[in-house]
Amino acid sequence: MTQSLTIRRPDDWHLHLRDGAMMRAVLPETARHFARAIIMPNLVPPVVTAQDALAYRDRIEAALPDGADFTPLMTLYLTEQTDPDDVEAAFADGLIHAVKLYPAGATTNSQSGVATLKNVYPVLERMAQIGLPLCIHGEVTDPQVDIFDREQAFIDTVLIPLRADLPDLKVTLEHITTSHGIDYVVGADGDIAGTITTHHLMINRNHMLVGGIRPHYYCLPIVKRASHQHALRRAATSGHPRFFLGTDSAPHLDGAKETACGCAGVFSATNTMSCLAHVFDEDGALVNLEAFTSLNGPARYGLAPNAATMTLEKRDHPTNYPAKFDTDDGPLTLFDPSTPLYWHVKD
């Protein structure tokens, strides 16, 4: 017998759409299931001003399929030259919903990010005053710190001092990958929340490294050991209001992934909801799927939940997803969850 679950239509609180041909290929995959998404600003060149954000939003809206019901929620890329007045005006106009902090060199297209945090304190102080959230890629870039330890080091040496200096700043610690990150978000005082990705719930570093290197599982923050994956699953499926979905769906062409020095990023927009239903079902927590995908995020960003609904069905045969998508510039590989998915989104 078919099992079904109806939830409010979900949102994605961390999404990379890229631009140009890639955006035209991947945007329909997000718009099919998600009503809204926080759009990452790490283009080349990055989205650093209100004018940049407006132009990017216009390009996204122009690329939407006919009849699509999708709202891009724009962000600005924080640099050491960011103007607090420009940020405040963009927020007041409803153009942006967050500012993104990339430590310089931490991930894809982060070269323009922040090298010295104190240099952006005037912007962060203004954000604290007006209630504008700061989304953080929480990893240090010190080459002496092991890549598997960079999230914990960031929390201990950067985030905790930052929040002590600016206790009123709204912070979203994005794509949490460790039990340390989960424990910090649960236990910290003040206005803190965290996003968790689809792929970090589904895989751990064994999936990436055992039996051969699988470049399409390479992402930043890098997948960790299974014990951290289990901590992420407990947090996501708990219904805790500080955790919500941010897929960090980050497409790269196969040629940029399947190479001697491949790019970091996982494209998961198409099958995310099937993956999440699988995780929550497996962990006996389907009752909390709606909170994670559809309720906690809007509450965090001061928005109402979507009025529309989505129905997921569990069938007795796996759902087949395309392994690859074609773009004008070459093929793109969809995230492989490494297990059959019996849940699907009902049309």
UniProtKB/Swiss-Prot annotation:
<protein>
    <recommendedName>
        <fullName>Dihydroorotase</fullName>
        <ecNumber>3.5.2.3</ecNumber>
    </recommendedName>
</protein>
<feature type="binding site" description="via carbamate group">
    <location>
        <position position="100"/>
    </location>
    <ligand>
        <name>Zn(2+) 2</name>
    </ligand>
</feature>
<feature type="binding site">
    <location>
        <begin position="16"/>
        <end position="18"/>
    </location>
    <ligand>
        <name>substrate</name>
    </ligand>
</feature>
<keyword id="KW-0665">Pyrimidine biosynthesis</keyword>
<feature type="modified residue" description="N6-carboxylysine">
    <location>
        <position position="100"/>
    </location>
</feature>
<comment type="subunit">
    <text>Homodimer.</text>
</comment>
<dbReference type="InterPro" id="IPR032466">
    <property type="entry name" value="Metal_Hydrolase"/>
</dbReference>
<dbReference type="GO" id="GO:0008270">
    <property type="term" value="F:zinc ion binding"/>
</dbReference>
<feature type="binding site">
    <location>
        <position position="175"/>
    </location>
    <ligand>
        <name>Zn(2+) 2</name>
    </ligand>
</feature>
<keyword id="KW-0378">Hydrolase</keyword>
<feature type="binding site">
    <location>
        <position position="248"/>
    </location>
    <ligand>
        <name>Zn(2+) 1</name>
    </ligand>
</feature>
<feature type="binding site">
    <location>
        <position position="16"/>
    </location>
    <ligand>
        <name>Zn(2+) 1</name>
    </ligand>
</feature>
<feature type="active site">
    <location>
        <position position="248"/>
    </location>
</feature>
<feature type="binding site">
    <location>
        <position position="137"/>
    </location>
    <ligand>
        <name>Zn(2+) 2</name>
    </ligand>
</feature>
<dbReference type="GO" id="GO:0006207">
    <property type="term" value="P:'de novo' pyrimidine nucleobase biosynthetic process"/>
</dbReference>
<dbReference type="InterPro" id="IPR002195">
    <property type="entry name" value="Dihydroorotase_CS"/>
</dbReference>
<dbReference type="GO" id="GO:0004151">
    <property type="term" value="F:dihydroorotase activity"/>
</dbReference>
<feature type="binding site">
    <location>
        <position position="220"/>
    </location>
    <ligand>
        <name>substrate</name>
    </ligand>
</feature>
<dbReference type="InterPro" id="IPR006680">
    <property type="entry name" value="Amidohydro-rel"/>
</dbReference>
<dbReference type="GO" id="GO:0005829">
    <property type="term" value="C:cytosol"/>
</dbReference>
<keyword id="KW-0479">Metal-binding</keyword>
<dbReference type="Pfam" id="PF01979">
    <property type="entry name" value="Amidohydro_1"/>
</dbReference>
<keyword id="KW-0862">Zinc</keyword>
<feature type="binding site">
    <location>
        <position position="252"/>
    </location>
    <ligand>
        <name>substrate</name>
    </ligand>
</feature>
<feature type="binding site">
    <location>
        <position position="264"/>
    </location>
    <ligand>
        <name>substrate</name>
    </ligand>
</feature>
<feature type="binding site" description="via carbamate group">
    <location>
        <position position="100"/>
    </location>
    <ligand>
        <name>Zn(2+) 1</name>
    </ligand>
</feature>
<dbReference type="GO" id="GO:0044205">
    <property type="term" value="P:'de novo' UMP biosynthetic process"/>
</dbReference>
<feature type="binding site">
    <location>
        <position position="42"/>
    </location>
    <ligand>
        <name>substrate</name>
    </ligand>
</feature>
<feature type="binding site">
    <location>
        <position position="137"/>
    </location>
    <ligand>
        <name>substrate</name>
    </ligand>
</feature>
<feature type="binding site">
    <location>
        <position position="14"/>
    </location>
    <ligand>
        <name>Zn(2+) 1</name>
    </ligand>
</feature>
<comment type="function">
    <text>Catalyzes the reversible cyclization of carbamoyl aspartate to dihydroorotate.</text>
</comment>
<dbReference type="InterPro" id="IPR004721">
    <property type="entry name" value="DHOdimr"/>
</dbReference>
<comment type="pathway">
    <text>Pyrimidine metabolism; UMP biosynthesis via de novo pathway; (S)-dihydroorotate from bicarbonate: step 3/3.</text>
</comment>
<comment type="similarity">
    <text>Belongs to the metallo-dependent hydrolases superfamily. DHOase family. Class II DHOase subfamily.</text>
</comment>
